[in-house]
Amino acid sequence: MSFNDTQEQFAPNMALVPMVIEQTSRGERSYDIYSRLLKERIIFLTGQVEDHMANLIVAQMLFLEAENPEKDINLYINSPGGVITAGMSIYDTMQYIKADVSTICMGQACSMGAFLLSAGAKGKRICLPNSRVMIHQPLGGYQGQATDIQIHAQEILKVKSRMNELMAQHTGKSIEEIERDTERDRFLSANEALEYGLVDKVYTQRS
């Protein structure tokens, strides 16, 4: 997780998106694949976590809650992490809305991706068997006058403390354990993430 809020390195994914064509009573209707999956209450969190992507994720969750606040939302995660403030906007929305958010890790959930994976509804946090999870403390860098550097250092320590508290709540670990285990990059397999309390289940196929 990066504490810096510079976004230049995080460009929206411009890859071609497949289209899906459906037959309706009024003829054919085409959707991009992500819009079609959104109809099934599936949201994809892929790539770097940054403001543009986070705003889209938040908007989709709010839309699905407005459509049906009693039905689960499925958040598929394949992310190396990213900017803390962007990730926290997703986190707060997950906790704020009435609908349960089930989190599913496919590929990787590292840094902020792992934090969001752990923040899913209890009993509904899932890892696919060959996924990788990585947790660590926030990263930051700042240049400027000594006083400004001190201010930013104090702020990143506050953020680190708060994130350790939240991770402890979601995993059942103590704050001391979280602080120790995130001192350096810690990589976990799907089963290790299950044992650690980051997820509740490891699925090899749909039940």
From Swiss-Prot:
Any one GO MF annotation of this record: ATP-dependent peptidase activity
Reaction equations catalysed: Hydrolysis of proteins to small peptides in the presence of ATP and magnesium. alpha-casein is the usual test substrate. In the absence of ATP, only oligopeptides shorter than five residues are hydrolyzed (such as succinyl-Leu-Tyr-|-NHMec, and Leu-Tyr-Leu-|-Tyr-Trp, in which cleavage of the -Tyr-|-Leu- and -Tyr-|-Trp bonds also occurs)
Keyword Transmembrane helix: no
Keywords from the named record: Cytoplasm, Hydrolase, Protease, Serine protease
EC number: 3.4.21.92
Subcellular location: Cytoplasm
GO cellular component, one term: cytoplasm
Catalytic residues identified in the record: 111, 136
Biological processes, Gene Ontology terms: protein quality control for misfolded or incompletely synthesized proteins
Pfam families in alphabetical order: CLP_protease
Statement: the UniProt record of this protein carries the keyword Protease: yes
TM spans (from-to): none
Main location: cytoplasm
Annotated family: Belongs to the peptidase S14 family.
HAMAP family: ClpP (MF_00444)
Purpose: Cleaves peptides in various proteins in a process that requires ATP hydrolysis. Has a chymotrypsin-like activity. Plays a major role in the degradation of misfolded proteins.
Subunit architecture: Fourteen ClpP subunits assemble into 2 heptameric rings which stack back to back to give a disk-like structure with a central cavity, resembling the structure of eukaryotic proteasomes.
Name used for this protein in its record: ATP-dependent Clp protease proteolytic subunit
Native source organism of the sequence: Proteus mirabilis (strain HI4320)
